[in-house]
């Protein structure tokens, strides 16, 4: 473990942009090394105090849906090489689960999420900020496939949510946050050149830590 603080790489982008694929490609390349993924999706606010009818109204694409205070606290703990207990979100109950996931600190932290660049406090903790930029048509197709297959949603409900919530929130919050990125990656996980560049950069960081 290095003596300096860990390096934080932020990977943002709209839902279905391919940011998770970019994150996984980078992480898989460094399996066995000192690297971890911290997903903003795990940090939706606890809503156990609300009745189910209120939880069902949750706008998961709005900045206020996230417990960024807890995310920042956990990120600061990891930067101090302290273990955290990552929360788990239950999408069937629309609230935080009682389950937690212990996460050990690593030398490289990949922070991934749709709105991580929207919060200046999170941006201040990142060393490298990436935005995965993908065509809107491809993003909605990917989101439909994910929500129908993994979350038991109907096609009509996914389309309705996209038109009334996802697209407006993307245009209002996610797209404008792109200006805070150091690097914009078009074509998401298919952009192997950009991924290779990031792999090379991270390899250099890890090598420097080993030589400290």
Swiss-Prot record:
Pathway: Pyrimidine metabolism; CTP biosynthesis via salvage pathway; CTP from cytidine: step 1/3; Pyrimidine metabolism; UMP biosynthesis via salvage pathway; UMP from uridine: step 1/1
Catalytic activity: uridine + ATP = UMP + ADP + H(+); cytidine + ATP = CMP + ADP + H(+)
InterPro entries: P-loop_NTPase, PRK/URK, Uridine_kinase, Uridine_kinase-like
Keywords: ATP-binding, Cytoplasm, Kinase, Nucleotide-binding, Transferase
Subcellular location: Cytoplasm
Residues binding ATP: 13-20
UniProt keyword Membrane present: no
GO biological process: CTP salvage; UMP salvage
HAMAP family registered for this protein in UniProt: Uridine_kinase
Family: Belongs to the uridine kinase family.
UniProt protein name: Uridine kinase
Organism of provenance: Bacillus cereus (strain G9842)
């Amino acid at each position: 473990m290095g003596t300096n603080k860990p390096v934080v790489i932020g990977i943002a982008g709209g839902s279905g942009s391919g940011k998770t694929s970019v994150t996984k490609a980078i992480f898989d390349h460094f399996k066995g090394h000192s690297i971890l993924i911290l997903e903003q999706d795990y940090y939706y606010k606890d809503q156990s105090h609300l009745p189910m009818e209120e939880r069902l109204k949750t706008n998961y694409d709005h900045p206020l849906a996230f417990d960024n205070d807890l995310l920042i606290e956990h990120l600061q703990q990891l930067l101090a090489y302290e273990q955290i207990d990552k929360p788990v979100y239950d999408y069937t109950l629309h609230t935080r689960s009682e389950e937690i996931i212990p996460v050990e600190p690593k030398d490289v932290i990949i922070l991934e999420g749709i709105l991580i660049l929207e919060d200046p406090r999170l941006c201040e903790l990142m060393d490298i900020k990436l935005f995965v930029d993908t065509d809107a048509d491809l993003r909605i197709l990917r989101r439909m496939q994910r929500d129908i297959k993994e979350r038991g949603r109907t096609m009509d409900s996914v389309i309705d949510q996209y038109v009334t919530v996802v697209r407006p929130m993307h245009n209002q919050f996610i797209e404008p946050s792109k200006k805070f990125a150091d690097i914009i990656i078009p074509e998401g996980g298919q952009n192997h050149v950009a991924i290779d560049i990031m792999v090379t950069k991270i390899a250099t960081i890890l090598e420097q830590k080993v030589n400290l």
